[in-house]
Amino acid sequence: KAPKSEVKIIDTIKYINPIIDKVVIGSYLKSLKVSPFLYGKLYTYSEDDYTITNTISSKLIEAMTCKLLPLIRDFQPDILIATHSFSTEMLSVLKSKYNMNIPCMSIITDYYSHSSWLHPYIDAYVVSNEDMINKMIFKGISKDTIYNLGIPVKPEFNMNYDRGETLESLDLCESKFTILVMGGSLGLGKIVDIYKQLTNINEDIQIIIITGKNKKLYAELSKIKDSSSKETRIIGFTNHVNKYMQACDLLLTKPGGLTITEALICKIPLGLFSPIPGQEEKNAQFLLRHNLAVNLTDIEKCSENIEKLLHSKNELKNMIENCSKFSKPYAGDDIFDLINWLVQNKSDKSSFPKEEKIYEKNNPKTFFKSAEKYFLKTALKLFEL
């Protein structure tokens, strides 16, 4: 839409300090593996704005934000956009502490507005559904800054693919009920247990499983497939998830924000398993509340619950209709229009801090070094648990 525009995309924490990025990601993945319950408790606990955790986190983010200033000054952007809660808080710090009068937008990529996303100096919040708005207003966010435009996904999800051709390319039957199983690009969740349950269903179904980059999972499923009576196709990493979604009748998946959005656009009812405690559990609650999904977290009852759904054509039809109601296939276009409006009405490049001013406030050279050391020390302790 704007071929002459220049866009710079950065992984914020990685750009600031690759070591901190590795520790953060490593600690996050380890906490999910070792104690997902504890992670969920921390997520819930941090909803309170005044916890020790949030206070420490805010101070560290404030200290790290100064490292973005040279990049911003050199690039001279018309607008800053964040798609993560850390980055959103950094944008708020940039406006409040460094008086940068350029528009800042945050796109919340889940179906629940956790407090970690909500900060006072953001000009526009893009959300995925109406349910989020009242919570945000209660937390002090102005209604005038909240835009229910949806989560943007790849344009390919708006392209129509022929179900018959896709299934034929996999040597599957177009008339059979087709179930797609996914666990994200890493193939996470209890996919093996889910597949074993699917093989017990007393209906003529066929199964497609996408394992992403998880080669171990691919090999394990392939062994089970050899002794299964259900027609099954196992696919590794693919760039054609949209084609497979449009070819299936039911998607079994973890409730990640982007996967949910893609499924709603493709009008596919969902079966939810292995939600990450915290944000994915909140996503699941939204889907179940609006009859967009069935709950498969009790793996032992997975085949029973899917059979019930197969026997209720009206229920499936209602779920598909609900997907249409909550789908926002043109979110990307609508967000682009909002970006244009913000740039035209709120951008002031003269407010960029001068080079000599960048390191003056709070003596961030010294402050950042001490904060960085403290963060690494704290995160490494968590990583060692």
Predicted segments with their positions:
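Conserved N-terminal ligand/cofactor-binding loop architecture of enzyme catalytic domains
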Residues: P3-L71
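Active-site and donor-binding regions of nucleotide-sugar-utilizing enzymes
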Residues: K41-G140, N148
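A nucleotide-sugar donor-handling region in carbohydrate enzymes
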Residues: D123-S185, N214
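Donor-nucleotide binding loops and adjacent catalytic segments primarily
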Residues: R163-E165, L172-C248
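Acidic donor-binding loop of glycosyltransferase active sites
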Residues: Q246-G256
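A short alpha->beta transition loop at the rim of the catalytic pocket in nucleotide-sugar-dependent
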Residues: C248-D249, K267-P269
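C-terminal "capping" alpha-helix adjacent to the active site of nucleotide-linked donor transferases
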Residues: H290, D298-N314
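C-terminal amphipathic helix plus adjacent low-complexity
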Residues: N314-L385
